[in-house]
Amino acid sequence: IQSILYDIYDDATETNDSVSLGLAPIYNVLTGAQKNTPALTSIFSFAAAIKAENPAADTDINTLLTAQSIVGSGMDIYGSTETNNAGNANVLPIYTDITANGIASSEVCSIKTFSTKNKLSVYRFFKFTANTTATYTFSASSTGTTSPAIDPDIKVFKDGVLVDKFETTGPSQTGDVDLSPGDYVIAIADFNNITEETNNEIGCFTLSITQI
């Protein structure tokens, strides 16, 4: 990520680097589209914005991204076109689409293969749109048995701001949130993967959202 940002900024022309936008376009994205994105901050939300605001540099920025094994062509803020799963089936999609119809999502798994806390796929992300002002129930249920026991925690975000979180101990997690219309991101992790240092633990669960 550091090299992509620097190569977008600098004047040097190197292998895979023909971009020289300077600081202003980067600053504009960081204080504008990136600051207000409904997605969580990532290379995808940043690159999608800087490409959109500097269309003449789109191809050259894609080349930079490709050199780092990131799919640039067609990129959106959610990384929907990404195909690099770092060799692990529990990485993609980065965001799973879900609707507030009470139907459980497909199974997703929180892993600590790449270490704990905020490392790759410790948190799994969902995105959904609230179409009306209402109370919504979020329910995460574990789908397997591991030691230590799976303990899903839920965080709800709007435009990068934490709206609410549910972190009681147990194999399932449920909470109600009053939401206004808009796009939301839900981050779910197995608590064991946030806090413990042993690798290769996996906690799998489904999520459902119900409008009350």
Sequence positions of predicted segments:
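Intrinsically disordered, low-complexity coil segments
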Residues: T15, G144-S147
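Extracellular attachment fibers and their assembly/anchoring modules
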Residues: F138-A140, D151-D153
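C-terminal edge strands of extracellular/lumenal beta-sandwich accessory domains
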Residues: R124-K127, T146, D153-V163, V177-I212
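Solvent-exposed serine/threonine-rich low-complexity stretches and specific carbohydrate-binding patches
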Residues: V163-P171
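Active-site-proximal alpha-helical
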Residues: I1-A56
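Beta-sandwich interaction modules
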Residues: G170-D178
